[in-house]
Amino acid sequence: MKPSSSNSRSKGHAKARRKTREELDQEARDRKRQKKRRGHAPGSRAAGGNTTSGSKGQNAPKDPRIGSKTPIPLGVTEKVTKQHKPKSEKPMLSPQAELELLETDERLDALLERLEAGETLSAEEQSWVDAKLDRIDELMQKLGLSYDDDEEEEEDEKQEDMMRLLRGN
């Protein structure tokens, strides 16, 4: 009362069928054909490689053999060397003209007014004002001018006035 062995095998899993010599030979030929096809397609260099995208004008890789379209002179020509222009230097002003420019400088006047009003300037502005005031002092010394001349004249006038008053004239 054993179940038949042939029925149980057919229902469970079938025995692996052996391939014939012809089938094995056919598979070998297919593998050899696939192996031959490895690498680039014939004529890929001339045709430009694989162009899977339909639009050739956009995003298509350029042919590396096609170069620039700019004309190249074939004869020997002398190169024209361009002279480098020196940077235009600031024109040298006379001390008198430079002093007048500094005295009429709007930025300097505005910053000095801010200082007189009690505002504090940034370090950059303060250093700029100091440099300009130092330059004004240098120019005034070169020209023989000083702020003290005006003050001395006023003091001399005051002294003379005092002397007149004391003398009683």
From Swiss-Prot:
Residues 148-157 are annotated as: Asp/Glu rich. GO terms for molecular function: GTPase activator activity. Residues 49-58 have a biased composition (Polar residues). Disruption phenotype: Dispensable for cell growth, cells lacking this gene have a shorter lag phase. It comes from the Bacteria. Residues 147-159 have a biased composition (Acidic residues). Keywords: GTPase activation, Ribosome biogenesis. GO terms for biological process: negative regulation of ribosome biogenesis; ribosome biogenesis. Residues 1-45 are annotated as: Not required for interaction with Der/Enga. A GTPase-activating protein (GAP) that modifies Der/EngA GTPase function, negatively regulating cell growth, probably via ribosome assembly. Stimulates the GTPase activity of Der; a construct missing the first 45 residues is even more stimulatory. Does not stimulate 2 other GTPases (ObgE and Era). Overexpression inhibits cell growth; precursor 16S rRNA accumulates, the 23S rRNA is 6-7 bases longer than usual, and 50S ribosomal subunits are improperly assembled, leading to 45S subunits lacking proteins L9, L18 and L25. Belongs to the YihI family. This is a highly hydrophilic protein; there is a stretch of highly charged residues in the N-terminus and a stretch of acidic residues in the C-terminus. This is Der GTPase-activating protein YihI. It comes from Escherichia coli (strain K12).
